[in-house]
Swiss-Prot record:
Binding-site residues, substrate: D118, G119, S120, S121, N211, Y244, Y262, L263, Y264, K274
Name of the protein described by the UniProt record: Fructose-1,6-bisphosphatase class 1
EC numbers, comma separated: 3.1.3.11
Family classification: Belongs to the FBPase class 1 family.
NCBIfam families with a match to the protein in the record: PRK09293.1-1, PRK09293.1-3
Keyword Magnesium listed: yes
InterPro entries: FBPase_C_dom, FBPase_class-1, FBPase_N, FBPtase, Fructose_bisphosphatase_AS
Catalytic activity: beta-D-fructose 1,6-bisphosphate + H2O = beta-D-fructose 6-phosphate + phosphate
Organism: Hahella chejuensis (strain KCTC 2396)
GO cellular component: cytosol
Gene coding for it: fbp
Domain of life of the source: Bacteria
Entry coiled-coil feature ranges: none
GO MF term list: fructose 1,6-bisphosphate 1-phosphatase activity; magnesium ion binding
CDD domains: FBPase
Length: 336
């Protein structure tokens, strides 16, 4: 008889790897798990309830907020505040970081950075969306209010990161710096079950993911790499397959499983890149490196080594199978 291991059991088993955690990480993940279940329920009702479409406001990025963006942000914020182990969060949907003012939260060891609903514009057309999260140990003294410096830490200081993908099934994939594991939600019993242990990205792949509609705005090195992917060469299994959903979590998850590269370069429209370093690039870079992959912003510039200077800092992102990222890096180094 096959023994099913739940997310809660798995985290408790791994707690011995972090003797200083004293159960706080278990509690923190319990909050994330709860909010994910609530969001799973609401997303599955999209189209039946009045939760799709624009909310009528813009977020700090100047992007149209969807109703589910607002809903997801509130659910995760409330869940993380309840346990007392998190002293504050920073969200892609909020201009400033959020202090948790309760006395129990002042002693919290951790801060969480989150993109509550990545790809939310796809909800109306029933395309997979996701949540991305990142956990750091605070640098300010415990017992005091959280500060901006607690959030402006380089990615290599993350102690946990992950994403939840709401697709044909709902999955939670995470790392605490000791490999990557995936858990599929079973709504009949209300638990996440270990379904993808020790995830490893293939060293090479045949899928590239980029919005080619913006080709004219890309740097020359990226244009050359796209042409390389499209050329015919039996020895390298080219032409490669182009797959782009427009939801970072969905594109990343597919490439993690099958092997591939995701590209979001700088452009004439977005000279600093479009994705957010703290909410998207850092957690995905931590995950991919733990799965045997590679993530860079520019040639020789590892995502996890970038020192952030502001909460909503943007950054180019090239992430995926290491051999594909290395090849892209060659083109950018030569042509810019």
């Amino acid at each position: 008889m096959e023994i099913i291991k739940t997310l809660g059991e798995f985290i408790i088993d791994r707690q011995k790897d972090y003797p200083d955690a004293s159960g706080e990480l278990t509690s923190l993940f319990s909050s994330i798990r709860l909010a994910a279940k609530i969001l799973h329920r609401e997303i599955n009702k999209a189209g039946l309830a009045d939760i799709t479409g624009a909310a009528g406001d813009e977020n700090v990025q100047g992007e149209q907020q969807q109703k589910l963006d607002v809903y997801a942000n509130e659910r995760f914020k409330n869940a993380l505040a309840q346990r007392g182990v998190v002293c504050g969060i920073a969200s892609e949907e909020e201009e400033q970081f959020v202090r948790f003012e309760e006395t129990k939260n002042l002693g919290g060891k951790y801060v969480v950075l989150i993109d509550p609903l990545d790809g939310s514009s796809n909800i109306d057309v029933n395309v997979s969306v996701g949540t991305i999260f990142s956990v750091y140990r605070r640098v300010s003294p415990e017992g005091e209010h959280v500060t901006e410096e607690d959030f402006l830490q380089p990615g290599h200081k993350q102690i946990a990161a992950g994403y939840i993908i709401y697709g044909s099934s709902t999955m939670l994939v995470y790392t605490t710096g000791n490999g990557v594991n995936g858990f599929t939600y079973d709504p009949t019993i209300g638990v996440f079950c270990l379904s993808h242990p020790n995830l490893r990205i293939p060293e090479d792949g045949t899928i590239y993911s980029i919005n080619e509609g913006n080709y004219i705005h890309f740097p020359e090195g990226v244009k050359k790499y796209i042409k390389f992917c499209q050329e015919e060469d039996d020895a390298t299994q080219r032409p490669y397959t182009s797959r782009y959903i427009g939801s970072l979590v969905s594109d990343f998850h597919r490439n993690l499983i099958k092997g591939g590269i995701y590209l979001y370069p700088t452009s004439s429209r977005y000279p600093e890149g479009k994705l957010r370093l703290l909410y998207e690039c850092n957690p995905m870079a931590f995950l991919i490196e733990q799965a045997g992959g590679k993530a860079i912003a520019n040639p020789g510039q590892r995502i996890l080594d970038i020192e952030p200077t502001k909460l909503h800092q943007r950054c180019p992102l090239f992430v995926g199978s290491p051999k594909m990222v290395d090849k892209l890096e060659q083109f950018i180094s030569e042509l810019g």
